[in-house]
Amino acid sequence: MLENIRDAVRKFLTGSTPYEKAVDEFIKELQKSLISSDVNVKLVFSLTAKIKERLNKEKPPSVLERKEWFISIVYDELSKLFGGDKEPNVNPTRLPFIIMLVGVQGSGKTTTAGKLAYFYKRRGYKVGLVAADVYRPAAYDQLLQLGNQIGVPVYGEPNNQNAIEIAKKGVDTFVKNKMDIIIVDTAGRHGYGEETKLLEEMKEIYEALKPDDVILVIDASIGQKAYDLASRFHQASPIGSIIITKMDGTAKGGGALSAVAATGATIKFIGTGEKIDELEIFNAKRYVSRILGMGDIESILEKVKGLEEYEKIQKKMEDVMEGKGKLTLRDVYAQIMALRKMGPLSKVLQHIPGLGVMLPTPSEDQLKLGEEKIRRWLAALNSMTYKELENPSIIDKSRMRRIAEGSGLEVEDVRELLEWYNNMNKLLKMVKRRRGSIDKLFGGKIG
């Protein structure tokens, strides 16, 4: 079960087991939990092989403890397993926007149609539902009930057995009524193993409707079997996306998610419960955060985010040294905020030039001095206008007074910040392209 991974993370971070042994134990628990959740065995062992490879090849940044660094790698690789940085676009690209839902029997397609309608209605769109599932007698009544529940009109013809005809007439009716989004619930008469028939029928309705989006609804309980269905669907309908339902009611949700992600298909939503509002946009990183225990890894992710932001500023400084552009006070602000995310002041102050705390182990008094200086500088930066941050040369005495008054500081504090900034730009120009210059400038590498 994936919840076991959360317990393993907590045990790993707080336990006293020697590091190497703790890593081996965690990887075994990770493999066991993923396989129990019906994640494909090859995917599981490929995942853990990548984790081990990174452990051997990469060095932990100084802002992270070894255990924190290991968990950040696990987080990164698990996120890739479930789809990575791919962010689904749920916004309609034009109006009216026609969505066609397809799925096998029992996938939760009709319920999902209602949830999807409610999702878009809450976003301010006028939504219409078309009941074109003519093979399940209760489908029309169920969709009508859902529509009444959320205040969305439903088009259907209970006595008509021609799904394509109903779908076309329903779409035409809602287009005339100026609906923004039209969701068509198509037939779900085929079971798992009958993918060919399902896709043939999907193509027929697609040709008739020419929808803007085709969404395949998959029940999470089929686990890794979702791969074949999702793969064939993705090949047949490149514009399509996928909704995985019933994530709350099965231990195989991870298997289904990883299987679909492996096909390259986009997972747009996941169903997380029976209620009408329990449909959420799928985000792999957010999902992995839940698996690992957000409370346990939040500080680690914050440090990693700070490191990434800091590296962007480092790159900007390299460009400045090569004569490309100029360091602005906005960059300084971003740098300080990034460093503050990375952890205790004792670990990051040495990387900020000009604070007089460039010692390997600064004293408590030096730390207090550095923290106070950072606090004053941030207050001053927060009181500056956009133009002042982008072009500090316009800050004259009257602007200094205004900034000082707005931040509760002395004019001398603002002058000190500007002097440091000017010296910083001069130093960057002097250093030029000498290798290792930024590391020397910042008192040692962070990453």
Curated annotation (Swiss-Prot):
The record lists the catalysed reaction(s) as: GTP + H2O = GDP + phosphate + H(+)
Where does it reside? Cytoplasm
Q: Please tell me where GTP binds in this chain.
A: 103-110, 185-189, 245-248
Would you say which domain of life the source belongs to?
Archaea
Report the top EC class in one word: hydrolase
* Any Pfam family matching the protein: SRP_SPB
The Enzyme Commission number assigned here is: 3.6.5.4
Q: Name one GO molecular function term.
A: GTPase activity
Q: Which GO terms describe its biological process?
A: SRP-dependent cotranslational protein targeting to membrane
Keywords in alphabetical order, please.
Answer: Cytoplasm, GTP-binding, Hydrolase, Nucleotide-binding, Ribonucleoprotein, RNA-binding, Signal recognition particle
Q: Where does the UniProt entry say this protein principally localizes?
A: cytoplasm
- Kindly state one GO CC term assigned in the UniProt record: signal recognition particle
Q: What does this protein do?
A: Involved in targeting and insertion of nascent membrane proteins into the cytoplasmic membrane. Binds to the hydrophobic signal sequence of the ribosome-nascent chain (RNC) as it emerges from the ribosomes. The SRP-RNC complex is then targeted to the cytoplasmic membrane where it interacts with the SRP receptor FtsY.
Question: What does the comment on domains in this protein's record state?
Answer: Composed of three domains: the N-terminal N domain, which is responsible for interactions with the ribosome, the central G domain, which binds GTP, and the C-terminal M domain, which binds the RNA and the signal sequence of the RNC.
The entry assigns this protein to a family as follows: Belongs to the GTP-binding SRP family. SRP54 subfamily.
Q: How does it assemble?
A: Part of the signal recognition particle protein translocation system, which is composed of SRP and FtsY. Archaeal SRP consists of a 7S RNA molecule of 300 nucleotides and two protein subunits: SRP54 and SRP19.
Protein name (database record) = Signal recognition particle 54 kDa protein
